[in-house]
Amino acid sequence: MSIQAPPRLLELAGQSLLRDQALSISAMEELPRVLYLPLFREAFSRRHFQTLTVMVQAWPFTCLPLVSLMKTLHLEPLKALLEGLHMLLTQKDRPRRWKLQVLDLRDVDENFWARWPGAWALSCFPEAMSKRQTAEDCPRTGEHQPLKVFIDICLKEIPQDECLRYLFQWVYQRRGLVHLCCSKLVNYLTPIKYLRKSLKIIYINSIGELEIHNTCWPHLIRKLYCYLKEMKTLCKLVFSRCHHYTSDNELEGWLVTRFTSVFLRLEHLQLLKIKLITFFSGHLEQLIRCLQNPLENLELTCGNLLEEDLKCLSQFPSLGYLKHLNLSYVLLFRISLEPLGALLEKIAASLETLVLEGCQIHYSQLSAILPGLSCCSQLTTFYFGSNCMSIDALKDLLRHTSGLSKLSLETYPAPEESLNSLVRVNWEIFTPLRAELMCTLREFRQPKRIFIGPTPCPSCGSSPSEELELHLCC
């Protein structure tokens, strides 16, 4: 029979205070720092929102991570905290012990509240204070700095989530006193005009990740250019399923020039992902030329590129240290792959992931990329499915991966000899050919996770994954 541990004195003190809400409110100014976090948790769990309103006005730490106390943000506790902050921000003289600089509404470490009481208890002792002065104890001088509210925002629908709508209105009414800092902003189906309204409220220079889905390039560039060029701390930029919707070549050229000029200001960009790349077909050099920072991750997928577009990839230093390159479903069967081979040779020392899935590469083109591929000693993931390869070409490809000892996940297409007139796998022919390919590969190295054949498998429905070791469906 297990014996439940008795409550700690700190917990008992907090519970005692919360039994009398009026007493707990009056005691805030003199409440020891060590009691603040457990008392706040208790008040939160008991829905003592009036206590929360008062506690935030005397918060003795620089950060308050609210969302880590709950799975999702709820309106009532948010209103209680913002009401307390409103009363405080409008005062010229603020409480002596109030040190709050950041209200964090992101999904951060849920162990924060369990871990920190002890740390704060330690910091209350003079010996600890003499050894290290934390940011919480550093005096603030001069004018009051704006309160920073951190949040990750995903705009999916109209009307907006009630918490987000309330927060936007609250911040807008306190411009200059509050900065709404958004480390990640994702826009799915929300019209661009609503995204613009959000960007007028968000502190633009705080956005580290931006994703825009399901819009059209002309509209996006016209409406968002003035905001994009100010996102100077942007690290990740994703455009997914942004459509073309213009047949005017002159207008298209102007739009591309205007858009690519944005990248001259993005000095911290590390990831660029553009799904439906056709809009930049023939213009990719303009974009790559404007990149100011060496990228780690480049994804240009789904569409058509010209040979001149491929050539530019190996000509600029911004792509010289790529760790991840994804060109999946960019149709490459009509152009020379020598520029791609040159790029692979250039980034061989850094490349970890290479995705050439569905590019319809023909076996006659393969020799152009094999020397570069064989040099990619850091490669861990290689997707090459849905390309047109003969059994001999696949054997040659596998031989060129013999020195890639770090490969842990790899996919290859079924050889064309196993395909029928409808380009479907004839399993009676395919099964021995796959065994032959595996035998060839094992002469050089032992694969870890490998998938040879159509994806997903029409027989068992499996697709390449980290869990799949060897695809042996018959």
From Swiss-Prot:
GO biological process terms, semicolon-separated: negative regulation of apoptotic process; negative regulation of cell differentiation; negative regulation of DNA-templated transcription; positive regulation of cell population proliferation; proteasome-mediated ubiquitin-dependent protein catabolic process
Signal peptide bounds: none
LRR-type repeats, residues: 97-124, 179-203, 204-230, 231-265, 266-291, 292-323, 324-342, 348-375, 376-400
GO terms for MF: ubiquitin-like ligase-substrate adaptor activity
Gene3D superfamilies: Ribonuclease Inhibitor
Keyword vocabulary terms for this entry: Leucine-rich repeat, Repeat
GO cellular component: Cul2-RING ubiquitin ligase complex; cytoplasm
Homology family: Belongs to the PRAME family.
Annotated protein name in UniProt: PRAME family member 2
Record organism: Homo sapiens (Human)
